[in-house]
């Protein structure tokens, strides 16, 4: 998928999604593309390392950070064969659903608009990562 800008625009056409980022997780742990001016553009290499690392129990108990925002993990199947999705929610008054999808080379991160249920993002994420996986991304 060479045109990430077009892909980001296509994902953001879904009115339930407020922000999106595509982040490398193997060789290059940086944001490849994101919504211009979006919060998820600030995802750090350290956060990617925590998301894809082998120590799952620490962030399941204490939560994790995505783009500097504290989140509590709802469901972690990010590294599970056949699933590849993590559901979380930002902490604080403006709690938003966060969904992270795993492909062979990248993580896709979605943040829902205020009031959007995480299950809706989860379903959308499964559709999106299926498409990326079929393209080898």
From Swiss-Prot:
<dbReference type="InterPro" id="IPR005455">
    <property type="entry name" value="PFN_euk"/>
</dbReference>
<dbReference type="InterPro" id="IPR005454">
    <property type="entry name" value="Profilin1/2/3_vertebrate"/>
</dbReference>
<protein>
    <recommendedName>
        <fullName>Profilin-3</fullName>
    </recommendedName>
</protein>
<dbReference type="GO" id="GO:0003779">
    <property type="term" value="F:actin binding"/>
</dbReference>
<dbReference type="GO" id="GO:0005634">
    <property type="term" value="C:nucleus"/>
</dbReference>
<keyword id="KW-0446">Lipid-binding</keyword>
<keyword id="KW-0206">Cytoskeleton</keyword>
<dbReference type="GO" id="GO:0032233">
    <property type="term" value="P:positive regulation of actin filament bundle assembly"/>
</dbReference>
<keyword id="KW-0539">Nucleus</keyword>
<keyword id="KW-0963">Cytoplasm</keyword>
<dbReference type="InterPro" id="IPR036140">
    <property type="entry name" value="PFN_sf"/>
</dbReference>
<keyword id="KW-0009">Actin-binding</keyword>
<comment type="subunit">
    <text>Interacts with ACTRT3.</text>
</comment>
<dbReference type="GO" id="GO:0030036">
    <property type="term" value="P:actin cytoskeleton organization"/>
</dbReference>
<comment type="function">
    <text>Binds to actin and affects the structure of the cytoskeleton. Binds to poly-L-proline, phosphatidylinositol 3-phosphate (PtdIns(3)P), phosphatidylinositol 4,5-bisphosphate (PtdIns(4,5)P2) and phosphatidylinositol 4-phosphate (PtdIns(4)P). Slightly reduces actin polymerization. May be involved in spermatogenesis.</text>
</comment>
<dbReference type="GO" id="GO:0005737">
    <property type="term" value="C:cytoplasm"/>
</dbReference>
<dbReference type="Pfam" id="PF00235">
    <property type="entry name" value="Profilin"/>
</dbReference>
<dbReference type="GO" id="GO:0008289">
    <property type="term" value="F:lipid binding"/>
</dbReference>
<comment type="similarity">
    <text>Belongs to the profilin family.</text>
</comment>
<dbReference type="GO" id="GO:0005856">
    <property type="term" value="C:cytoskeleton"/>
</dbReference>
<dbReference type="GO" id="GO:0030833">
    <property type="term" value="P:regulation of actin filament polymerization"/>
</dbReference>
<dbReference type="InterPro" id="IPR048278">
    <property type="entry name" value="PFN"/>
</dbReference>
